[in-house]
């Protein structure tokens, strides 16, 4: 039964064809028929080899229409900065006590922020937070004195991205319940951020392939130029 359902969902999607962005979004939304609000994800295959330091792609982007998901934020801070984080809506705020909780394997948050003075302490959590992509980093604005701004950005649609070993960068950019225009704006914002993060060591064609999909639906390949405005060299 599940196989027939999958076959029906996949009907009309040509895996060899590149679709215009607006058409691809419509196709993905039509096929997001699960009983929950499926996440829409975009993936970009880049012409980089992240094994080389000068070809790493990493950054953060504030999606104009948010992600549609509730983001739980933890902040490592003391004193006035801890109070600032709480006032901004942080879900968990602490210092040594929060380190102990995380070391004990209790990670009840999706994003982690720290003030610079807390990093020697937070550094102990590298083996726990690093593999999960949660380690605070000044390059993506999660090591900062502006904890209120970072908390609000995290809860308002900030998405971190980092290229994987195969040269792929991907992110959830909304929900199937979003209208097509909102999804298109989010996808373009994400693509723009990835292009701006193009490393100096990247040679040749930078954006090789782009595709979008829903949680349970098929991937729909997109003409890169319809996302980037022009083929990225």
From Swiss-Prot:
**Taxonomy, superkingdom:** Bacteria
Keyword entries, A-Z: Repressor, Ribonucleoprotein, Ribosomal protein, RNA-binding, rRNA-binding, Translation regulation, tRNA-binding
List the GO cellular component terms: cytosolic large ribosomal subunit
The reply on keyword Protein biosynthesis is no
Sample GO molecular function, one term:
rRNA binding
Is rRNA-binding a UniProt keyword of this protein?
Answer: yes
Q: Which InterPro entries match?
A: Ribosom_uL1_bac-type, Ribosomal_uL1, Ribosomal_uL1-like, Ribosomal_uL1/biogenesis, Ribosomal_uL1_3-a/b-sand, Ribosomal_uL1_CS
GO terms (BP aspect): regulation of translation; translation
A family per Pfam: Ribosomal_L1
Complex and partners:
Part of the 50S ribosomal subunit.
User: What is its biological role?
Assistant: Binds directly to 23S rRNA. The L1 stalk is quite mobile in the ribosome, and is involved in E site tRNA release. Protein L1 is also a translational repressor protein, it controls the translation of the L11 operon by binding to its mRNA.
Question: NCBIfam families given for it?
Answer: rplA_bact
Q: Which family does it belong to?
A: Belongs to the universal ribosomal protein uL1 family.
Query: HAMAP family per the record?
Result: Ribosomal_uL1_B
Name it. Answer: Large ribosomal subunit protein uL1
């Amino acid at each position: 039964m599940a196989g027939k359902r999958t076959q029906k969902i996949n009907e009309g999607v040509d895996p060899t064809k590149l679709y215009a962005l607006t058409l691809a979004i419509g196709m993905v939304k039509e096929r997001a028929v699960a009983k929950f609000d499926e996440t829409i994800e975009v993936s970009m295959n880049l012409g980089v080899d992240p094994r080389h330091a000068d070809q790493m792609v990493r950054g953060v982007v504030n999606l104009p229409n948010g992600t549609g998901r509730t983001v739980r934020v933890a902040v490592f801070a003391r004193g006035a900065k801890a109070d600032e984080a709480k006032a901004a809506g942080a879900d968990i705020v602490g210092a040594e006590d929060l380190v102990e909780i995380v070391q004990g394997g209790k990670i009840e948050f999706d994003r982690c922020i720290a003030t610079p003075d807390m990093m020697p302490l937070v550094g102990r959590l590298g083996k726990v937070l690093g593999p999960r992509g949660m380690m605070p980093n000044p390059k993506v604005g999660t090591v900062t004195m502006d904890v209120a701004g970072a908390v609000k950005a995290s809860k308002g649609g900030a998405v971190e991205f980092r290229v994987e070993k195969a040269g792929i960068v991907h992110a959830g950019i909304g929900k199937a319940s979003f209208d097509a225009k909102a999804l298109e704006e989010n996808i373009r914002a994400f693509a723009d951020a990835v292009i701006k993060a193009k490393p100096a060591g990247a040679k040749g064609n930078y954006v090789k392939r782009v595709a979008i999909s829903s949680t349970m639906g098929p991937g729909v390949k997109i003409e890169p130029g319809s996302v980037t405005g022009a083929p990225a060299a």
